[in-house]
Amino acid sequence: MSEVKDVIVQGLWKNNSALVQLLGMCPLLAVTSTATNALGLGLATTLVLTLTNLTISSLRRWTPAEIRIPIYVMIIASVVSVVQMLINAYAFGLYQSLGIFIPLIVTNCIVVGRAEAFAAKKGPALSALDGFSIGMGATCAMFVLGSLREILGNGTLFDGADSLLGSWAKVLRIEVFHTDTPFLLAMLPPGAFIGLGMMLAVKYLIDERSKQRKARAARAVSVAPADVTGKA
């Protein structure tokens, strides 16, 4: 159980692919102009990570070490092709918005990296959980960045959600504030870099405060027995 918890915590926070490893920067910065696009690509990446980790882990005993990387790439490309066709069939608007970044998941360092570092060494269930956790960590980072850029740039949230979830999702659109002229800096790649930098700074502050709290707690625990011994 502790190993399962560690895999989840590592994927979502401690080893977040976007905020710690800084992998997959190209789609992270290019697609996160809206929350819908960010969520769509994040979920697609999560599905690919989960399925590829599961498949590669299941076949690891029969995969020759000398040609493992080409085999991994073939498996990843097959899964990405299936996901791309599903998005094309059931979310065509999102498919048009994401464009080339769906097939580019094949070359994403996150997917290949988890296949080599984790799935090739662990069991199928734990590997699938690792892929899901890493994918959801990246999805959360994409979604926060996409929401931030969309709100600052257009004053809206979940604009175009119907392209991902269907026509009923039009009701999810929120106009945070009205603007006649979009804030282009937030919508363009420089705004993505600035937003990502802010997210990295916030994560660093949270981690530092957590370390300080743990250090204070450890000192308090170490001082308490000394006091008891002194009184005795």
Curated annotation (Swiss-Prot):
The keyword Transferase does not apply. It comes from the Bacteria. It is an enzyme of class 7 (translocase). The complex is composed of six subunits: RnfA, RnfB, RnfC, RnfD, RnfE and RnfG. GO terms for cellular component: plasma membrane. PANTHER family: ELECTRON TRANSPORT COMPLEX PROTEIN RNFE, ION-TRANSLOCATING OXIDOREDUCTASE COMPLEX SUBUNIT E. It is a multi-pass membrane protein. InterPro entries: NqrDE/RnfAE (IPR003667), RnfE (IPR010968). One of its GO terms (biological process) is electron transport chain. HAMAP family: RsxE_RnfE. Its EC number is 7.-.-.-. Belongs to the NqrDE/RnfAE family. Part of a membrane-bound complex that couples electron transfer with translocation of ions across the membrane. The chain crosses the membrane at residues 39-59, 69-89, 92-112, 125-145, 182-202. Keywords: Cell inner membrane, Cell membrane, Electron transport, Membrane, Translocase, Transmembrane, Transmembrane helix, Transport. This is Ion-translocating oxidoreductase complex subunit E. It holds the Pfam family Rnf-Nqr. It is found in: Cell inner membrane.
